Structure formats: structure tokens, C-alpha cells
């Protein structure tokens, strides 16, 4: 049996561009992709913190160091410049390996500056 597990996450990045007429995708700073282990053309899910939209597309690289997050094509109708996003990729792992799997999680401030990288989501307390 395979389990679908979180592989990489960009937590609370800010949309810097939304281009309805660009070929579909989400362009992101290559440094961001490297931190989360997201590959170019990999399927990603995007969760818009500001409006609750959830959608799928694929990743493409933007210039390294640019801090760009550009939502393109039809997806541009689901995210506006300034919106905060959570961008995730997933991997299928054999059941026996799933309990030991650790995702790559990059956390950002409001200016798309990476503040830390982690291998787990903090435990939620009451």
C-alpha cells in the first residue's frame, strides 16, 4: 500500500504577480523551490489563506533570489497580488516508510523572506 504524504511546503508566501494570460502554472523563486524540494513541472496544490480557494497547478522556476510567486493562467482568478498562499507538493510512499517520512517546510514572512526551514509541523496545543 502507498500513502500520499506531504513532501514540501511553502508556508504563507505572498503573491507578487497574477497573470491571467500567461501559460498556466505557478512561478516561484528557485530558492523557494529548492528549500521545499519542489521540482519544476511538479504538480502542486495551492491553498489561499485570504479567500479560502484551493486549487492545483504545476510549478515553474522564477529567477533565483527574486522572491517571485506568480500565479498564472486560469489560476490567476483564484489568487490576487498580496494574497498569502500555502503551496504544497505530495509524494507517494510505501506504508512501511510513511511513519518515518519528514517533509521539507519553509516558513515566510510578509515580504517573502524565508525565515526558517523545518522537517515537521509544530504540535497544535489547546
UniProtKB/Swiss-Prot annotation:
The modification Pyruvic acid (Ser) is found at residue 25. Is synthesized initially as an inactive proenzyme, which is activated by self-cleavage at a specific serine bond to produce a beta-subunit with a hydroxyl group at its C-terminus and an alpha-subunit with a pyruvoyl group at its N-terminus. Substrate binds at residues 57, 73-75. Keywords: Autocatalytic cleavage, Cytoplasm, Decarboxylase, Lyase, Pantothenate biosynthesis, Pyruvate, Schiff base, Zymogen. Pathway: Cofactor biosynthesis; (R)-pantothenate biosynthesis; beta-alanine from L-aspartate: step 1/1. It is found in: Cytoplasm. Binds 1 pyruvoyl group covalently per subunit. Coiled coil: none annotated. It comes from the Bacteria. Heterooctamer of four alpha and four beta subunits. Catalyzes the pyruvoyl-dependent decarboxylation of aspartate to produce beta-alanine. Belongs to the PanD family. This is Aspartate 1-decarboxylase.
